[in-house]
Structures are given as structure tokens and as C-alpha cells.
Amino acid sequence: MKKMKVTQFKSGAHRLKSHKACLKGLGLRRINHSVVVEDTPSTRGMVNRVNYLVKVEEA
């Protein structure tokens, strides 16, 4: 399955609870933290919801 690298570049503090939950679901904890996740519709949805907080690259 395809993978993608997601990097958090903005803080999750003072954001909507649902956006904080998406960051937690992706495994992101702090600024400049990167994780490699599978490219599935559910992870794409989480990334799209917090697209102003993260950068996405192919892994």
C-alpha cells in the first residue's frame, strides 16, 4: 500500500477538539514531528481536515 509522510508545522494548541483529535489519530505530537502513514481514505480525510497544520509528502 502507498505511504505518505505527514509533518506537523503549526501548533495544535487552541484548535477545535476535532482537529486535535485528527492530529492525535495521525500520531502527531509536536511541531516538526513527522510520521509515515498508509495512504487510505480515512487518513486522507484526517489530513484534509488539518491541512493548515501539516505538510504531506510521498514516502
Curated annotation (Swiss-Prot):
Keywords: Ribonucleoprotein, Ribosomal protein
Xref: CDD domains: Ribosomal_L30
Cellular-component GO terms for this entry: cytosolic large ribosomal subunit
An example Gene Ontology biological process: translation
Entry GO MF terms: structural constituent of ribosome
InterPro entries (alphabetical): Ribo_uL30_ferredoxin-like_sf, Ribosomal_uL30_bac-type, Ribosomal_uL30_ferredoxin-like
Family statement drawn from the similarity comment of this UniProt entry: Belongs to the universal ribosomal protein uL30 family.
UniProt-recorded name of the protein: Large ribosomal subunit protein uL30
Provenance organism: Psychrobacter cryohalolentis (strain ATCC BAA-1226 / DSM 17306 / VKM B-2378 / K5)
